[in-house]
């Protein structure tokens, strides 16, 4: 059994405002992230993602950073982090992040018209984060070559489904009765 699947089956589930939320090293930083799990995930991303001609990896803070940093190190593709803090630098673009449990503004720098980007994220659940990111990247004029999320939580509304983007995932899960259920071990794409 692969490490990602087992780590999800072992993940504790909490309820946050009537939303069942799994707590996982990739999405939450707890329990601690073991290097062999991160290595497995990075290798699977590199095998699944369309990387040819990608100029930049784009990821949201905070939980996409560790995954994307490791992918950047393995591929020599530069990394851009979409942050929750505004710096007011030239070319900074703001975007709205609306998830199942929060709403916030995020900011992107160093992505320009014509850039070819790979978007990486930890979890695809409501699609709010990825919808905001893809909208901002389109507004900038960047070309989104591929989008990969490590884990997809199925069920419920997913804002990215209403877009022209297909998100690849490594594994798809659901949460029922406070337990993680594996829906598709191979994910999407």
UniProtKB/Swiss-Prot annotation:
Name assigned to this protein: HGPRTase-like protein
InterPro entries registered for this protein in UniProt: HGPRTase-like (IPR026597), PRibTrfase_dom (IPR000836), PRTase-like (IPR029057), Pur/Pyrimidine_PRTase (IPR050118)
Family note: Belongs to the purine/pyrimidine phosphoribosyltransferase family. Archaeal HPRT subfamily.
UniProt keyword annotations, A-Z: Purine salvage, Transferase
Gene3D superfamilies: 3.40.50.2020
HAMAP family: Hypx_phosphoribosyltr (MF_01467)
PANTHER family named in the record: HYPOXANTHINE/GUANINE PHOSPHORIBOSYLTRANSFERASE (PTHR43864), XANTHINE PHOSPHORIBOSYLTRANSFERASE (PTHR43864:SF1)
EC number of the protein: 2.4.2.-
Keyword Transferase in annotation: yes
Role played: May catalyze a purine salvage reaction, the substrate is unknown.
One of the Pfam families matching this protein, by short name: Pribosyltran
An example molecular function term from Gene Ontology annotations: transferase activity
GO BP of this protein: purine ribonucleoside salvage
Claim: Transferase is one of the keywords in the record: yes
């Amino acid at each position: 059994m692969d490490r990602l699947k087992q780590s999800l089956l072992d993940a504790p589930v909490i309820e946050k405002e009537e939303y069942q939320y799994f707590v996982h090293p990739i999405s939450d930083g707890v329990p601690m992230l073991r290097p062999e799990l991160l290595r497995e995930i990075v290798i699977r991303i590199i095998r699944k993602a369309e990387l040819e001609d990608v100029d930049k990896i784009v990821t949201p803070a905070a939980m996409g950073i560790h995954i994307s940093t490791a992918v950047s190190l393995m591929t020599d593709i530069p990394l851009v982090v979409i942050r929750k803090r505004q710096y007011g630098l030239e070319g900074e673009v703001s975007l709205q992040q609306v998830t199942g449990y929060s709403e916030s503004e995020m900011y992107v720098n160093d992505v320009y018209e014509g850039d070819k980007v790979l978007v990486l994220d930890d979890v695809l659940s409501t699609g709010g984060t990825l919808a905001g990111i893809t909208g901002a990247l389109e507004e900038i004029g960047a070309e989104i070559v591929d989008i990969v999320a490590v884990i997809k939580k199925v069920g419920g509304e997913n804002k990215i489904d209403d877009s022209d983007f297909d998100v690849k995932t490594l594994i798809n899960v659901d949460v029922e009765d406070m337990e993680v259920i594996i829906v598709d071990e191979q994910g999407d794409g």
